[in-house]
């Protein structure tokens, strides 16, 4: 894959870069695996904003993606690779030998016609899913479960992957892309390979409107607000805020650690790398 840089025929097109995607299917998605989505625009059941900067955007159907890979030892053939507006990775429509079709997160290197399978002792081949205890140390994987049978939770975004670095007893040790080292049960399933669309981080939307198409609204700086709206607000003329960066509710931000889950602290061997 390669990046396409738009010709600057207008101000909005001047900085646009996108990923060339000839291998993606150009038709409609598989209708039986679609669901309607209702937008909450960041509001809760009382109508209050609980997540800022959300609203609007293009209507989208949700693609039902199989994160559990629970059709054991039934071979499947990849019919096509598709774009999914709900995630950064591409998805693959696979046809199982028993006639069922499912969407899965497409790994890099998977193409139409490829054969994949999920099973206890599946081959170490891109797209195959099997428990971590049966995967060789050093293998690069994605779509890793956090609990056996719960479905993939780690490394699902475009271009992400996890390396299996050790197996000891009932636990496997994983090295995340962030640098974090953590243990998960060796019975958790993972898929071989890294996630597709690894050039996604090089894409430039080019204009504010492209964010609006995605349902993302503008982010106003705290120093541009009034004191009633933000701790950084107010002041005569332009100010720096006068204090260390905080959220609108006074909680320190920009590097402030908010993790509070003592139950799983023991599973983290090394915290993620910080700048």
UniProtKB/Swiss-Prot annotation:
- Which keywords fit this entry according to its UniProt record? Ribonucleoprotein, Ribosomal protein, RNA-binding, rRNA-binding
Q: Does the keyword RNA-binding apply?
A: yes
Polar residues bias spans: 39-49
**What SMART domains does the annotation carry?**
Ribosomal_L2, Ribosomal_L2_C
Entry-linked Pfam families: Ribosomal_L2 (PF00181), Ribosomal_L2_C (PF03947)
Sequence segments annotated as region (Disordered): 35-55, 223-260
Tell me which GO cellular component terms the UniProt record holds: large ribosomal subunit
- A Gene Ontology MF term for this entry? transferase activity
Instruction: Spell out the InterPro entries in the cross-references.
Output: NA-bd_OB-fold, Rib_uL2_dom2, Ribosomal_uL2, Ribosomal_uL2_bac/org-type, Ribosomal_uL2_C, Ribosomal_uL2_CS, Ribosomal_uL2_dom3, Ribosomal_uL2_RNA-bd_dom
Could you state one GO biological process linked to this protein? cytoplasmic translation
Q: What's this chain's function?
A: One of the primary rRNA binding proteins. Required for association of the 30S and 50S subunits to form the 70S ribosome, for tRNA binding and peptide bond formation. It has been suggested to have peptidyltransferase activity; this is somewhat controversial. Makes several contacts with the 16S rRNA in the 70S ribosome.
Recorded family membership: Belongs to the universal ribosomal protein uL2 family.
**Quaternary form?**
Part of the 50S ribosomal subunit. Forms a bridge to the 30S subunit in the 70S ribosome.
Q: What is this protein called?
A: Large ribosomal subunit protein uL2
This protein's species is Methylococcus capsulatus (strain ATCC 33009 / NCIMB 11132 / Bath)
């Amino acid at each position: 894959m390669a990046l396409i840089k738009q010709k600057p025929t207008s101000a909005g097109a001047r900085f646009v870069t996108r990923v060339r995607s000839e291998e993606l299917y150009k038709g409609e998605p598989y209708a039986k695996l679609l669901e309607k989505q209702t937008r909450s625009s960041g509001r809760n059941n009382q109508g209050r904003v609980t997540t800022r900067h959300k609203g609007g955007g293009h209507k989208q159907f949700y693609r039902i993606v199989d994160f559990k890979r629970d059709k054991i030892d039934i071979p499947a053939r990849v019919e096509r690779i598709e774009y999914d507006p709900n995630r950064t990775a591409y998805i693959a429509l696979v046809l199982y030998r028993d006639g069922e079709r499912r969407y899965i997160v497409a790994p890099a290197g998977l193409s139409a016609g490829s054969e994949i399978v999920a099973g206890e002792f599946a081959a170490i081949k891109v797209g195959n899913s099997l428990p971590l205890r049966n995967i060789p140390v050093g293998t690069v994987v994605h779509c890793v479960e956090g609990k056996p049978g719960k479905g993939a939770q780690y490394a699902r975004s475009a271009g992400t992957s996890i390396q299996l670095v050790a197996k000891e007893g009932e636990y496997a040790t994983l090295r995340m892309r962030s640098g974090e080292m953590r243990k998960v049960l060796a019975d958790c399933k993972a898929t071989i390979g890294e996630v597709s669309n690894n050039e996604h981080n090089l894409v430039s939307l080019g204009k504010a409107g492209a964010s609006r198409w995605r349902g993302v609204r503008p982010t106003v700086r705290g120093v541009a607000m009034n004191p009633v709206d933000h701790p950084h607000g107010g002041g005569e003329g332009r100010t720096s805020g006068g204090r260390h960066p905080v959220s609108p509710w006074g909680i320190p931000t920009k590097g402030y650690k908010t993790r509070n889950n003592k139950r799983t602290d023991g599973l983290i061997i090394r915290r993620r790398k910080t700048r």
